[in-house]
C-alpha cells in the first residue's frame, strides 16, 4: 500500500460528543450564534465570549528537513501526501484581535501521557474515541514545522485552548460530570479540533476542482478561493502563501452556536484583511519538493533594533521610545530590543532586562522583565524588506498611555484592543532595525 494513499483509504471517522454521558451541556436550545447576541448571556458555559469566532487553520508543509526522504519518512514528517495538516483551532474575539495564554494554571506540558490516562482508555462507551486512538490521529495529521509535533499541540492548547470559555473546568462540573478535571478539556479541545479539520477536507476540495500538487502547474488566487468557498457554504476562505508564492495555509472562519462541546460551527466569511498570495502564478508544490531557485525557510529569524512611538495622537509633535523595562520615555537613549521568531509563528520581544509580555491584570501593560521564555508573550510583527515594521499583540496594533513622560520621567504603555482607544495618548510601536 502506498503511504501517499493512506489518508484516502482510511476515511477516518469523526468522533462526536453526542453520546458522552454526564457532560452534555445543559444550555437553552434557542441560544444565539456567537457574536450575534443583542443582550447579555448569563451562562458563559453555554455561550462563547469574547472569542466567538473560531478559525480552523490548516498547513500545507511541503519543505522536508532534508532532500531525498522516502515516502515513509515524508509522511512521518509532513503528514499524508494527500492531506493538509492541522495548525490549530483559534477563538478570535468578536470585535477583532484575540486573547492568548489566558490561564497559566490550565497550561499543559504533555499530551502523550495525558491521552494515555486510564480515564480516556477504560473501554468507557460514553467516549466516542479513546485517548490512545485520538493520539494516533494527532500524530498523523497534526504536524509541526520542526519535527517535534507534540510541542505544537502543547503550544496550541496553551495559547488558544485556555482561552475557550465553554470548556473551563467549572463548566464540566456544572454539567454534572463525575471526577472530571482539566484533563477532560484538553482531550475535548484536541478531539473537536480534529473533528472540524476532518469535515473541512481542503485537499479533496481542491482536487475536485482540478487543483492538485504540481511542480509545473500554477493557479490563480480566484481559482483557489472559489473552489474552497463552494464547499464552505459560499463563504470566503483565507489562503496564505510562502515566499515562493506557494500555497501553504488555509483558514476557515466559523461562528459557534452554544458550547464548544456542541460542535455546532457555522461558516462565515474570512475576516482577514489581505493575503500574501499573488493574484496569479500560485504554486501548490507536492510534499517533499524543494524549490531549487530559493533557500530553505529561515525558521529562526532574529531582528535587533530599537522601538519608537509612531504617530502619537495622529501626528502631534511629541516623541518617544521604549526603554528596557517596556516603559515610554521622551528623552534619553532607547534600549536595544530583540525580536525572536517563535517556533510556531509570532515573535518574542526581549531586552537585556528580560522577555516582554502583556499583563492583563494590569490593564494590558507592557512589561519586560521575565527571565524564562515560558513567561514570554508572543507579539505580532510584519517586517519589511529592510527589517523595520510595527509591533502588535493578539492581532491588535493599537497602543496607548495615560501620561506623557516629560524630561527624564517614564510612563507605562498599554495594548489597547478597542477601536476608540480610550487612552489619552495613542500611538503605534515601530521597530527600527539596527
Curated annotation (Swiss-Prot):
- Which residues constitute the signal peptide according to the record? 1-18
Report which reactions are catalysed by this protein: a ribonucleotidyl-ribonucleotide-RNA + H2O = a 3'-end 3'-phospho-ribonucleotide-RNA + a 5'-end dephospho-ribonucleoside-RNA + H(+)
> What's a single GO MF annotation on this record?
ribonuclease T2 activity
Give the subcellular location. Answer: Vacuole lumen; Cytoplasm
Q: Which residues form the active site?
A: 87, 156, 160
Its domain of life reads Eukaryota
Q: Which GO terms describe its cellular component?
A: cytosol; extracellular region; fungal-type vacuole; vacuolar lumen; vacuole
Q: Name one GO biological process term.
A: mRNA catabolic process
Upon changing residue 160 to F, the result is: Impairs cytosolic tRNA-cleaving activity
Tell me which InterPro entries the record gives: Ribonuclease_T2_eukaryotic, RNase_T2-like, RNase_T2-like_sf, RNase_T2_His_AS_1, RNase_T2_His_AS_2
Q: What induces it?
A: Up-regulated by heat shock and osmotic stress.
Q: Does the keyword Hydrolase apply?
A: yes
Q: Which Pfam families match?
A: Ribonuclease_T2, RNaseT2L_C
Q: What is its EC number?
A: 4.6.1.19
Q: How is it modified after translation?
A: N-glycosylated.
The glycosylation sites annotated in the UniProt record are 37, 70, 103, 123
> Does the keyword Glycoprotein feature in the UniProt annotation?
yes
Question: What keywords does the record list, in alphabetical order?
Answer: Cytoplasm, Disulfide bond, Endonuclease, Glycoprotein, Hydrolase, Lyase, Nuclease, Signal, Vacuole
Similarity-based family: Belongs to the RNase T2 family.
Report further notes: Present with 504 molecules/cell in log phase SD medium.
User: What is the annotated role of this protein in its UniProt record?
Assistant: Rnase which modulates cell survival under stress conditions. Released from the vacuole to the cytoplasm during stress to promote tRNA and rRNA cleavage and to activate separately a downstream pathway that promotes cell death. Involved in cell size, vacuolar morphology and growth at high temperatures and high salt concentration.
Protein name per Swiss-Prot or TrEMBL: Ribonuclease T2-like
Amino acid at each position: 500500500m502506498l503511504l501517499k494513499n493512506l489518508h484516502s483509504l482510511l476515511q477516518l471517522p469523526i468522533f462526536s460528543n453526542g453520546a458522552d454521558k454526564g457532560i452534555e451541556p445543559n444550555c437553552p436550545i434557542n441560544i444565539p450564534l456567537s457574536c450575534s447576541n443583542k443582550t447579555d448571556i448569563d451562562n458563559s458555559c453555554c455561550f462563547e465570549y469574547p472569542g466567538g469566532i473560531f478559525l480552523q487553520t490548516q498547513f500545507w508543509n511541503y519543505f522536508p528537513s532534508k532532500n531525498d526522504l522516502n515516502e515513509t519518512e515524508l509522511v512521518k514528517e509532513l503528514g499524508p501526501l494527500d492531506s493538509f495538516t492541522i495548525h490549530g483551532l483559534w477563538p478570535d474575539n468578536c470585535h477583532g484581535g484575540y486573547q492568548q495564554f489566558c490561564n497559566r494554571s490550565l497550561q499543559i506540558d504533555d499530551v502523550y501521557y495525558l491521552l494515555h490516562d486510564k480515564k480516556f482508555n477504560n473501554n468507557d462507551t460514553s467516549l466516542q474515541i479513546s485517548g490512545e486512538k485520538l493520539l494516533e490521529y494527532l500524530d498523523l495529521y497534526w504536524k509541526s514545522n520542526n519535527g517535534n509535533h507534540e510541542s505544537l499541540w502543547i503550544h496550541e492548547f496553551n495559547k488558544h485552548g485556555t482561552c475557550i470559555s465553554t470548556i473551563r473546568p467549572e463548566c464540566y462540573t456544572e454539567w454534572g460530570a463525575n471526577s472530571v478535571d482539566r484533563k477532560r478539556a484538553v482531550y475535548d479541545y484536541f478531539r473537536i479540533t480534529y473533528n472540524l479539520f476532518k469535515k473541512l477536507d481542503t485537499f479533496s476540495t481542491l482536487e475536485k476542482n482540478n487543483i492538485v500538487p504540481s511542480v509545473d502547474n500554477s493557479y490563480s488566487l480566484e481559482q483557489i478561493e472559489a473552489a474552497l468557498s463552494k464547499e464552505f457554504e459560499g463563504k470566503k476562505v483565507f489562503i496564505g502563501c510562502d515566499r515562493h508564492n506557494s500555497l501553504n495555509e488555509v483558514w476557515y472562519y466559523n461562528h459557534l452556536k452554544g458550547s464548544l462541546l456542541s460542535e455546532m460551527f457555522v461558516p462565515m466569511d474570512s475576516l482577514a484583511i489581505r493575503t500574501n498570495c499573488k493574484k496569479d502564478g500560485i504554486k501548490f508544490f507536492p510534499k517533499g519538493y524543494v524549490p531549487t531557485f530559493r533557500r530553505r525557510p529561515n525558521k529562526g529569524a532574529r531582528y535587533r533594533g530599537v522601538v519608537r512611538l509612531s504617530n502619537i495622537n495622529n501626528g502631534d509633535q511629541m516623541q518617544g521610545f521604549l526603554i528596557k523595562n517596556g516603559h515610554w520615555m521622551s528623552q534619553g537613549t532607547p534600549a536595544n530590543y530583540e525580536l525572536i521568531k517563535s517556533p510556531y509563528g509570532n515573535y518574542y520581544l526581549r531586552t537585556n532586562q528580560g522577555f516582554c509580555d502583556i499583563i492583563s491584570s494590569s490593564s494590558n501593560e507592557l512589561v519586560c522583565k521575565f527571565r524564562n521564555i515560558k513567561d514570554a508573550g508572543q507579539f505580532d510583527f510584519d517586517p519589511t524588506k529592510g527589517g523595520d515594521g510595527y509591533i502588535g499583540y493578539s492581532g491588535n496594533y493599537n497602543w496607548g498611555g495615560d501620561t506623557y513622560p516629560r524630561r527624564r520621567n517614564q510612563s507605562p504603555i498599554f495594548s489597547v484592543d478597542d477601536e476608540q482607544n480610550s487612552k489619552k495618548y495613542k500611538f503605534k510601536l515601530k521597530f527600527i532595525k539596527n
